Protein backbone atom coordinates (compact mmCIF):
# COMPACT_ATOMS: atom_id res chain seq x y z
CA UNK A 1 0.00 0.00 0.00
CA UNK A 2 1.37 3.41 -0.92
CA UNK A 3 1.60 6.28 1.52
CA UNK A 4 -0.11 9.54 0.63
CA UNK A 5 -0.89 12.79 2.31
CA UNK A 6 -4.53 13.55 3.06
CA UNK A 7 -4.52 16.10 0.23
CA UNK A 8 -3.14 13.58 -2.27
CA UNK A 9 -5.73 10.97 -1.28
CA UNK A 10 -8.55 13.50 -1.57
CA UNK A 11 -7.23 14.62 -4.97
CA UNK A 12 -7.23 11.02 -6.15
CA UNK A 13 -10.79 10.49 -4.90
CA UNK A 14 -12.00 13.68 -6.61
CA UNK A 15 -10.28 12.67 -9.84
CA UNK A 16 -11.91 9.23 -9.80
CA UNK A 17 -15.34 10.71 -9.08
CA UNK A 18 -14.97 13.27 -11.88
CA UNK A 19 -13.77 10.63 -14.36
CA UNK A 20 -16.69 8.30 -13.59
CA UNK A 21 -19.48 10.89 -13.52
CA UNK A 22 -19.57 13.99 -15.74
CA UNK A 23 -22.14 15.64 -13.47
CA UNK A 24 -19.63 15.88 -10.60
CA UNK A 25 -17.99 19.27 -10.16
CA UNK A 26 -15.97 21.08 -7.52
CA UNK A 27 -16.86 24.51 -6.14
CA UNK A 28 -15.16 26.36 -3.35
CA UNK A 29 -13.00 29.23 -2.27
CA UNK A 30 -9.71 29.17 -4.15
CA UNK A 31 -10.09 25.70 -5.69
CA UNK A 32 -8.98 26.86 -9.12
CA UNK A 33 -6.46 29.52 -8.15
CA UNK A 34 -3.06 29.06 -9.74
CA UNK A 35 -1.26 29.62 -6.41
CA UNK A 36 -2.15 26.02 -5.50
CA UNK A 37 0.88 24.47 -7.18
CA UNK A 38 1.63 22.23 -4.22
CA UNK A 39 0.98 18.61 -5.30
CA UNK A 40 -0.29 17.89 -1.79
CA UNK A 41 -3.28 20.21 -2.28
CA UNK A 42 -6.60 18.43 -2.71
CA UNK A 43 -7.49 20.31 -5.91
CA UNK A 44 -4.01 20.35 -7.48
CA UNK A 45 -4.21 20.00 -11.27
CA UNK A 46 -7.98 19.56 -11.43
CA UNK A 47 -8.68 22.94 -13.06
CA UNK A 48 -6.17 22.17 -15.80
CA UNK A 49 -7.55 18.66 -16.31
CA UNK A 50 -11.31 19.39 -16.16
CA UNK A 51 -11.52 23.10 -16.95
CA UNK A 52 -13.45 26.00 -15.40
CA UNK A 53 -16.79 24.39 -16.18
CA UNK A 54 -16.20 21.71 -13.56
CA UNK A 55 -13.79 23.42 -11.15
CA UNK A 56 -15.38 26.65 -9.96
CA UNK A 57 -14.01 29.30 -7.65
CA UNK A 58 -16.66 30.82 -5.41
CA UNK A 59 -16.79 34.04 -3.44
CA UNK A 60 -16.05 34.02 0.27
CA UNK A 61 -19.71 33.53 1.10
CA UNK A 62 -21.14 30.41 2.66
CA UNK A 63 -24.64 31.45 1.56
CA UNK A 64 -23.50 31.72 -2.07
CA UNK A 65 -21.79 28.32 -1.94
CA UNK A 66 -24.87 26.72 -0.38
CA UNK A 67 -27.11 28.34 -3.00
CA UNK A 68 -24.85 27.10 -5.79
CA UNK A 69 -24.90 23.56 -4.39
CA UNK A 70 -28.69 23.49 -3.94
CA UNK A 71 -29.36 24.94 -7.38
CA UNK A 72 -26.88 22.62 -9.08
CA UNK A 73 -28.32 19.55 -7.38
CA UNK A 74 -31.83 20.60 -8.42
CA UNK A 75 -30.56 20.59 -12.01
CA UNK A 76 -29.11 17.07 -11.69
CA UNK A 77 -25.49 18.05 -11.08
CA UNK A 78 -23.37 16.68 -8.25
CA UNK A 79 -21.46 19.43 -6.42
Where are these regions (language model features)?
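Thiamine diphosphate
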Residues: 1-79
